[in-house]
Amino acid sequence: MLQQRAADKYHSPMLWTNTCCSHPREGETTVEAGKRRLQEEMGFCTELTDVMSFIYKAPFDNGLTEHELDHILIGYYEEPPIINPDEVAAWRWALPEDIRKDIAAHPEKYTEWFKIIFEKYEEKLGN
């Protein structure tokens, strides 16, 4: 499940990306933060597993730069989400091979961090 970021986001608006993003609050685990933001952004809860982490740095067109430790959390959910329009403009189901082809053909449609996440996750799976 991919989401398209809302038009009013301060960076990377209207770009396609991972299902949700979060930063843990004080005393909150990475998985707890992921569950919280999944509910806030996509309107559902599911069990999540932390499968890997990595550090990335990416500059944005608005002069900001992100330099973060990212965790990739995986969960399973088969129903349509109830998106928060302040966070999400649209969503879609996508197969990994279709994502790979679309990123190759249209990298400008995806967030910088998602392109890194997708590549790292495929490497981990051995694709």
Regions found by a protein language model. Give the residues of each.
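A short coil-to-beta-strand element that immediately follows conserved catalytic motifs
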Residues: F44-F54
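A broad structural signal for alpha-helix termini and local helix breaks/kinks
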Residues: M42-G43, Y77
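Structural signal for conserved beta-strand scaffold positions within catalytic alpha/beta enzyme cores
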Residues: L2, D50-M52, W93
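Nudix hydrolase/Nudix homology domain
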Residues: M14-W16, C20, F54-F60, L64-N127
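N-proximal short alpha-helices
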Residues: Q3-A7, H11, T46, L64, ...
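Conserved Nudix-box catalytic region and its N-terminal flanking loop in Nudix hydrolases
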Residues: M1-R36, E40, A105
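Acidic-residue sensor for enzyme active/binding pockets
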Residues: E28, E40-E41, E68, E87
